[in-house]
């Protein structure tokens, strides 16, 4: 077994939240129990598409927002 990863602190929907260092946005969405295609995401005020979440490693101090996608026509 590997050693536990250190924790980083970030803001999740305006509240303090910690995750292991190296966690991706995709991993956090799943760990929080969300269905990935039912939630939209932004980090530091910038929208992050579902296809880009696995590549977006969270950093100490990031501000993450999870919200319902807006659909319609």
Predicted regions mapped to residue ranges:
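Ubiquitin-like/PB1-type beta-grasp interaction modules and other compact soluble beta-rich domains
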Residues: 1-72
């Amino acid at each position: 077994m590997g050693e536990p990863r250190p924790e980083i602190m970030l803001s999740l929907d305006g509240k303090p939240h910690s995750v292991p260092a190296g966690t991706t946005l995709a991993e956090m969405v799943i760990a929080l129990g969300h269905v990935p295609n039912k939630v939209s995401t932004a980090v530091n005020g910038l929208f992050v598409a579902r296809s880009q979440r696995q590549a977006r490693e969270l950093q100490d101090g990031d501000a993450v927002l999870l919200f319902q996608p807006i659909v319609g026509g």
